[in-house]
Design a protein with these regions (language model features):
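Ribonuclease/tRNase effector modules and their secretory precursors
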Residues: 1-85
């Protein structure tokens, strides 16, 4: 299951564009287009449950102290949304 990491900073950014964390998270289930950017983040064009089409800029959260799991049981790094509009 996809996990998201939200902090006050990115919540304020999406709120300024009239979006909630729930809407942005749900948009990950309705993706029209996604591409990797030069900085390693992703730019995604998607749709919220209400039908609003949005751009979401995100990356996998950086976890420096994670030890590789020889059995492959590590959960994918959480999604850190940089902004959505």
């Amino acid at each position: 299951m996809r996990q998201f990491k939200w902090i006050e900073w990115n919540l304020e950014k999406i709120d300024a564009h009239g979006l909630s964390a729930d809407e942005v998270e749900a948009a990950f289930n309705r993706v029209f287009h996604i591409e990797e950017r030069k900085d390693g983040s992703f730019q995604m064009f998607a749709q919220t449950p209400s039908g609003r089409r949005v751009w979401v800029i995100w990356r996998h959260d950086r976890v420096d102290d994670e030890i590789p799991d020889a059995f492959g049981d590590l959960i994918e790094a959480p999604v850190f949304v940089i902004t959505a509009y």
